[in-house]
Amino acid sequence: MITKIDKNKVRKKRHARVRSKISGTESRPRLNVFRSNKNIYAQVIDDVNGVTLASASNLDKDFGSAESKVDAASKVGELVAKRASEKGITSVTFDRGGYLYHGRVKALAEAARENGLEF
């Protein structure tokens, strides 16, 4: 019998492999991306202290509206970059969360770069 591969399980395994190698510090925090079927979330995390420094998602009150999921991801990238720069964060380590660097993840990353985050 052929069994179907659970994509999320494989993604979590990939993410765990990446997380063993990268970690966010206070001077260079980690920009983490989580993507569900409907929404996208981004957090700037200091792993040393275990603190989220800035976050954004398309569920935020000041988000507005977006025509597509990719458009929403780029707006979330703008929001998280602005909130991080308000806290004095300019340089981050990008953690794509085990997702491919394509589509919504790529749109979020490029928008964050355009709005002042370096990675």
Curated annotation (Swiss-Prot):
GO MF annotations, alphabetized: 5S rRNA binding; structural constituent of ribosome
Please, which domain of life does this record's source organism belong to?
A: Bacteria
Reply yes or no: does the keyword RNA-binding apply: yes
Q: Which GO terms describe its biological process?
A: translation
Record's InterPro entries?
Answer: Ribosomal_uL18_bac-type, Ribosomal_uL18_bac/euk
GO cellular component terms, semicolon-separated: cytosolic large ribosomal subunit
Alphabetical UniProt keywords: Ribonucleoprotein, Ribosomal protein, RNA-binding, rRNA-binding
Indicate yes or no for the key word ATP-binding.
no
**Entries under Gene3D superfamilies matching the protein:** 3.30.420.100
Compositional bias (Basic residues) spans?
9-20
**Residue span of region Disordered:** 1-25
Q: What does this protein do?
A: This is one of the proteins that bind and probably mediate the attachment of the 5S RNA into the large ribosomal subunit, where it forms part of the central protuberance.
The record describes its quaternary structure and partners as:
Part of the 50S ribosomal subunit; part of the 5S rRNA/L5/L18/L25 subcomplex. Contacts the 5S and 23S rRNAs.
Similarity remark: Belongs to the universal ribosomal protein uL18 family.
Q: What is this protein called?
A: Large ribosomal subunit protein uL18
- Species of provenance: Listeria innocua serovar 6a (strain ATCC BAA-680 / CLIP 11262)
Which gene name does the record give? rplR
